[in-house]
Amino acid sequence: MNSRPLLVTCGLPYTNGPCHLGHLRTYVPADFYVRFMRRKGEEVVFICGSDNHGTPIVVSAEKEGTTPRQISERYHTHFSDTFTKMQVHFDHFGMTDDPTTHARTKHLVSRLIDRGYVYPKVIQQAYCIHCQKFLPDRYLEGICPHCKKPARGDECDQGCGKHLEPGEILEPTCKICGNRAEYREQEHFFFKLSGFQDWLREYLGELKGTDNAINYALGWVNEDLHDWCITRTLEWGVKFPGHDDLVVYVWVDAPIGYIGFTEEWAEKTGRDWKTYWCGENTRVTHFIGQDITYHHCVFWPAMLHGAGYGTPYAVVASGMLKIDDHKFSKSRGYVVWTNEDYLDQGLPADYLRYYLLSYTSHTKEMNFSWQLFQERINNEVVNNLGNFIYRSLHLSQKQFGGVPEGVVEQEIFDRITEAIGQVTGLVEAYDFKGAVDAILALSAWGNTYIQSKEPWKLAKTDQAAMAQVMRNCLQLAKALTLLIEPVMPERAGLIWSQLGQDSLIANNGFSAGLEPLSPGPLPAPSIVFSKIDDKMTQELDKRLRDRIDALDAEKKPKTPEISIEEFAKVEMKTGKILSAEQVPKSTKLLKLQVSIGDEVRQIVSGIAQFHNPEELVGKDVVVCTNLKPAKIFGIESNGMILAAGDNASLLRPETPVPSGTKIR
């Protein structure tokens, strides 16, 4: 066991919208890791909070006619409540807009200034003449200078993903009014990131965590690092020391929130926050989405090192999320909202936790679909784990009233010991899928064991042999319950009670899985894992499809409306086709002679692929008669035959009417 204090953090949820599955890809694995490390005896502090500053929140507040603080408080409460429902339990969940983080930010930035790592510089800043204001970050959109894709003011979100400094974006456009912005000079402050290049290269060589985070950061550090503008022209945020007209950039105060939240936790628990953030023996592990790797592996450690703080021990970055094999997109409807689409539908938090941890490697892109979700839960959780645990409890309770007398065989203890060691090694290597697979492998072995021993037959022939089998199975069930608790804590707690355990399962280490159950009665077991039926899956999938279709329909260009007076200008009459022939050298056009009562019109129509000329003669049609004459393939056309659909179905009167009758 490592004696260095362990502090685990999660990337801060931004208080500008509700929780979705993309968020949980970070928070559930972090909670799993914390629970697991505590089960193996480590003392762990689990810290997080909400990110409250930056232009998107200001823009949203302006649209709603409220304040950034009110929006932040609303979504802070939302995330806190959602995490509780998802069994993600932080020791402290703070707000970056609270006084502690404001004070810690000013202190850390002041130390960087005092040590010569921050300097002023006049730069080109986007300015909207119409709105008469400078446009930081998300107030601005334009074209990425690197990949030429559409981009936000501070990030190329639709292309290369690079961070953009003020003044870099091409074709700057104000998001408030939509007018083109211009660049004007303004003084801002820069952090000397370029001065940390050699140190960062050495630091990243020692950083623990996942390879996707470390390798991505090394790719940046091995290029030329540019100094980083750390101020913005905003009223909302942490004031830059000595300049009340500027605030620090949100990616400065957001990670400093980790320290501020630790201070708040330490104050209420009587601990010393410096134990976790100062000195060389700190062990801070950040769980993040891979889209914010640059900030956590380059900007953040350089700031900490420059200010004299300890640096992160490990960075664990999750892969991105796809919905139904489509890129995650809120604007296109490819999103699953944690509350609205999942928890509010009565689905267990534990099932979603299992899927997020077991579907694929933590660092790889994850695909979510309701069909896949149903298959994984029913086949792996219910048919494997649930089946073994319920059969073990049911047969033991039915035949012996509980745990039978006897001694667990050594083979069972060996299997449990091996599984605990294997799972522990995988978790410590941040291979969460591998760890869950190893737990399910022990359960699968248990199913094979009970099937091969056939205790239901032994009940009639050899009670002592059956007692031995069930004693072994119950010990496996106990160990499995302890191992699966970090994955599915709520269900594990229910099984723990059915195993006759009075203690909280969270207060037991994995070694308890090797402690024999006391012989004696057990309560009648109940089914803990239920299958997800086809009807529910279809309903959930329909919700997703309806959202996608609705948003897609909104984006389709609408046909411009016209007035009744404009429509009245269009003259349409019934007609009868007198002759029809193919236009030479054309596969699509027919030349028609059409009677419209008092005259015969020559009309060229693109219906040749769907109608034989000889079959058209004598047919009634509807003709637009007041179109200007046009030449098509060199032939004059005086009107238009009306047809519908891809097969050019001809429109005709319901009952015969004289040619030349007006359509009204």
Swiss-Prot record:
Catalytic reactions on record: tRNA(Met) + L-methionine + ATP = L-methionyl-tRNA(Met) + AMP + diphosphate
PROSITE patterns: TRBD (PS50886)
Keywords: Aminoacyl-tRNA synthetase, ATP-binding, Cytoplasm, Ligase, Metal-binding, Nucleotide-binding, Protein biosynthesis, RNA-binding, tRNA-binding, Zinc
Domain tRNA-binding, residue spans: 566-664
GO MF annotations in UniProt: ATP binding; metal ion binding; methionine-tRNA ligase activity; tRNA binding
Disulfide bonds: none
The protein's required cofactors: Zn(2+)
Pfam family, one: tRNA_bind
Keyword Disulfide bond carried by entry: no
Class in the EC hierarchy, top level: ligase
Keyword Cell membrane: no
Motif 'HIGH' region mapped to chain: 13-23
Compartments it resides in: Cytoplasm
Domain of life, source organism: Archaea
SUPFAM superfamilies with a match to the protein in the record: Anticodon-binding domain of a subclass of class I aminoacyl-tRNA synthetases (SSF47323), Methionyl-tRNA synthetase (MetRS), Zn-domain (SSF57770), Nucleic acid-binding proteins (SSF50249), Nucleotidylyl transferase (SSF52374)
Similarity annotation: Belongs to the class-I aminoacyl-tRNA synthetase family. MetG type 1 subfamily.
Name of the protein in question: Methionine--tRNA ligase
